[in-house]
Amino acid sequence: MGMRMRMMFTVFLLVVLANTVVSFPSDRDSDGADAEASDEPVEFERDENGCCWNPSCPRPRCTGRR
């Protein structure tokens, strides 16, 4: 019974360690800044004048040249 208890304890420690590593917050993919959420997808992004240059943009687009 001693060997089985030792194995169960080892498995328990491995599970606890794995959960700790997985749940540890990682900031590798972001620059650490909180970006403001947008309702529009990236393809409908507007330029500094508020113009959407994608032909399928849902709102009125600016006319003229870029």
Curated annotation (Swiss-Prot):
Quote the cellular component terms of the Gene Ontology held in the record. Answer: extracellular region
What organism, scientifically named, is this protein from?
Answer: Conus bullatus
Its recorded name reads Conotoxin Bu1.4
Q: For the region Disordered, what residue ranges are annotated?
A: 25-48
Its family remark reads:
Belongs to the conotoxin A superfamily.
Propeptide intervals in chain numbering: 24-46
Q: In which tissues is it expressed?
A: Expressed by the venom duct.
Q: Where is the composition biased (Acidic residues)?
A: 32-42
Q: Does the keyword Disulfide bond apply?
A: yes
GO molecular function terms attached to this record: acetylcholine receptor inhibitor activity; ion channel regulator activity; toxin activity
Q: Which UniProt keywords apply?
A: Amidation, Disulfide bond, Ion channel impairing toxin, Neurotoxin, Secreted, Signal, Toxin
Q: Where in the cell is it found?
A: Secreted
In the record's own words, the domains note is:
The cysteine framework is I (CC-C-C). Alpha4/4 pattern.
Sequence positions bearing Threonine amide: T63
| Cleaved signal peptide residues | 1-23
Q: Which cysteines are joined by disulfide bonds?
A: C51-C57, C52-C62
